[in-house]
């Protein structure tokens, strides 16, 4: 099962910069790899920086914040994990930039310059269809099945934030779309049964939801995108319903 091309996009530009005033300024570095199923995986490393998903869109606290992902100068995602998948790229050179954002979405600056990491990545040709065809085959999780919970809260600025608790499974962004390794994998998130994205960590921003009672479901998948099931054959997943509007 491959990912849709433009998942969880969060375009536009946010607030002006906020100068970091402390002695130990944050740093950010990034690495980009081609995902075997299409798209790219972006890996982020920081120092002196706390990703605070629960404080997103609230008052500025120095040293806290989240990430913004830009592709060719356009903001496409707000994200909270140190690895993120993005499918909305095509073959050729793309400029990938990760920006350190404060809780209130101001860009962190140092000496007046934004604190960012940037690289140009050549997206390889991808010859087969990136979209899924039918349901993936289930894989029985070896040993005790992991536990999975999800809660969803309105974001004070826009959209919603989903918070996931997972115990007993290794989230392995570096092996996504690779060979199956027992106990490893990633998560898929769904809105009313429609796949929204692939997750490598415990929190994600959902830019918009339809009005009404909306089901948010998170499910565990193998590295090669097969659904994990427990010994009884039931999918390892969690869901919650959000009233929107």
Spans of model-derived segments:
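Short beta-strand elements bearing conserved aromatic residues within extracellular beta-rich modules
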Residues: 67-69, 187-189
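Short amphipathic, basic-aromatic surface patches that mediate peripheral association
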Residues: 46-58, 166-178
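Short beta-strand segments within Ig-like beta-sandwich modules, predominantly Fibronectin type-III
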Residues: 74-81, 194-201
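Short acidic/polar inter-strand loop motif in beta-rich domains
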Residues: 101-109, 221-229
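Proline/serine/threonine-rich low-complexity linkers at boundaries of modular beta-sandwich domains
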Residues: 12-24, 133-144
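Short, flexible loop/turn segments at beta-strand junctions in immunoglobulin-like
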Residues: 86-90, 206-210
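Structural beta-strand segments of beta-rich domains
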Residues: 26-28, 36-42, 146-148, 156-162
């Amino acid at each position: 099962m491959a990912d849709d091309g433009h998942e969880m996009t969060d375009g536009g530009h946010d607030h002006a910069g906020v100068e970091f005033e402390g002695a130990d300024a944050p740093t950010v570095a990034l690495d980009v790899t081609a995902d075997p199923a299409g798209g790219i995986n972006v890996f982020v490393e920081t120092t002196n920086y706390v990703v605070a998903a629960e404080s997103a869109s609230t008052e500025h606290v120095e040293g806290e914040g989240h990430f913004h992902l830009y592709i060719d100068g356009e903001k496409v995602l707000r994200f909270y994990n140190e690895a993120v998948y993005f499918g909305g790229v095509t073959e050729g050179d793309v400029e990938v930039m990760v920006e350190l954002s404060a809780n209130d979405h101001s860009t962190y600056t140092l000496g007046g310059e934004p604190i960012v990491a940037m690289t140009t990545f050549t997206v390889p040709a991808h010859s087969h269809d990136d979209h899924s065809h039918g349901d993936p085959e289930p894989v029985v999780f070896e040993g005790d099945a992991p536990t999975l919970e999800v809660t969803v809260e309105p974001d004070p600025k826009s959209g919603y934030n989903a918070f996931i608790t997972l115990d007993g499974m290794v989230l392995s962004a570096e092996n996504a779309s690779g060979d199956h390794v027992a106990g490893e994998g990633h998560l898929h998130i769904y809105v009313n049964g429609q796949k929204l994205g692939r997750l490598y960590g415990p929190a994600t921003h959902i830019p918009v939801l339809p009005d009404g009672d909306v089901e948010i479901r998170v499910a565990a998948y193998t590295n090669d995108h097969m659904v994990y099931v427990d010994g009884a054959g039931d999918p390892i997943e969690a869901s919650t319903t959000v009233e929107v509007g």
